[in-house]
A protein has these predicted regions:
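Active-site neighborhoods and metal-handling regions in enzymes and metal-associated proteins
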Residues: 1-274
Length: 274
């Protein structure tokens, strides 16, 4: 999974220069698609089963009060927006097995045949981006959410329990006046993108499955300025928003638990083993 994680991290690094006021949000989706075709990588979110429709895009792009799974679309980013970009990508593939450049990413049914049954190396990561100059409220939310991510990862030690992760995140976020989304959680990874165990970002220490060496997990706290409660877009069954219109932020890393501590697989260069 290292190759997949390195490639996904390079995408997020590239987005740092792309995302700015006036950018059409759809260009984020186009950038990810282009990079995937150049490096022969499958965007694994295309074709994921949904309650009302299969997910049709390579990215999830949430703005301000959007919590998760929002569709990329034509929207001009504004000064002060808070953007979250989430994606799941394969490792670079051998073209003799599959030539990704020849796939039609807009044909969801066709893509589903390649993505849903994929069982190779993959990586899952979401990152938040400040669009231009943002308010202190946005800065503080981003800081606390990022801190929640690393506080949770630090708890992913051999012998600890799943509940230790969520309890640490919840205690930190709520002590600073923020809400922790309950409906959407982290998860195990491999050989498919969503595996047991589920990893809540809230809970009680000392509870849940005991963590073992070799487990690959994601931690992806969604932290809100107001209540933790969210609504779902019933037209698509995918996008979520805060019910009170408050801001929501998310950061996500995928990592493997080693005897020496968690090793981040989607590191953008500033992280390592705790």
């Amino acid at each position: 999974m290292d190759r997949a994680g390195d490639f996904l991290a390079s995408i997020h690094i590239g987005l740092r220069d792309l995302i700015k006021p006036g950018l059409d949000l759809w260009e984020v989706e186009e950038y990810v698609r282009r990079r995937c075709k150049e490096e022969n990588v499958l965007p694994l979110q295309i074709g994921v089963d949904g309650h009302m429709m299969d997910y049709p895009y390579a990215t999830c792009c949430g703005i301000n009060d959007e919590v998760a799974h929002a569709f990329p679309r034509h929207y001009k980013l504004k000064e002060g927006d808070l953007l979250k970009v989430d994606m799941v990508l394969s490792e670079p593939l051998d073209k003799s097995v599959l030539d990704v450049s020849k796939l039609d990413f807009n044909n969801v049914a066709l893509m589903k045949k390649h993505t849903v049954d994929y069982t190779g190396g993959l990586a899952d990561s979401c990152w938040a981006y400040a669009v231009g100059t943002v308010s202190q409220e946005v800065k503080d939310l981003m800081d606390v959410t990022r801190e929640c991510l690393y506080i949770g990862i630090e708890q992913a030690q051999v012998g600890n329990r799943i509940g230790d992760i969520g309890a640490a995140i919840q205690e930190y976020a709520e002590s600073r006046g923020y809400g922790v989304v309950r409906d959407l959680v982290g998860h195990g990874v491999g050989p498919t993108m969503h595996e047991e165990p589920m990893v809540p970002h809230f809970g009680r220490a000392g509870r849940g499955l005991r963590l073992k060496e070799g487990m690959v997990l994601t931690i992806e706290p969604m932290i809100n300025t107001g209540t933790w409660e969210i609504d779902t877009d019933m037209k698509t069954g995918w996008a979520h928003k805060t019910i009170d219109g408050g801001l929501s932020c998310q950061y996500e890393h995928q990592f493997v638990i080693t005897k020496d501590g968690p090793r981040i697989l989607t590191s953008q260069g500033e992280e390592g083993t705790y």
